[in-house]
């Protein structure tokens, strides 16, 4: 389970952002997780809930997870399609000259603070 490492990295980034903006307490954090990022949202949330208990800045902070759809682009027919449904093979022209546009990333979208 690598989700714990991703949670620790996210918490480190949140601390840096909070320090730069003189934030003392965070109410909620929105994290975007790509459909093919290999991070399982349920495990991420479980690790988050465990990790923030030790963090005064984040204690009781709500975690909001938003999925990023996995979209693949076909270089031959220049169309986009759902990676989850079709994988690497383009459903329009059957080409395998494709690459992932979105869905592999994990990013902090929003941090809501308490004044």
Region spans (language model):
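Short, flexible, mixed-charge glycine/proline-rich loop motifs
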Residues: 62-69, 79-84
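Short loop/turn motifs enriched for small/polar and acidic residues
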Residues: 32-36, 66-70, 111
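Short acidic DE-rich linear segments
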Residues: 114-115
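Long, charged N-terminal interaction/targeting segments
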Residues: 1-61
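Cys/His-enriched microdomains
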Residues: 72, 88, 106
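Short metal-binding segments enriched for Cys and/or His
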Residues: 100-110
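Short functional micro-motifs and their immediate structural scaffolds
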Residues: 82, 95-99
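Short cysteine-rich clusters marking metal-coordination/redox-active sites
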Residues: 74-77, 90-93
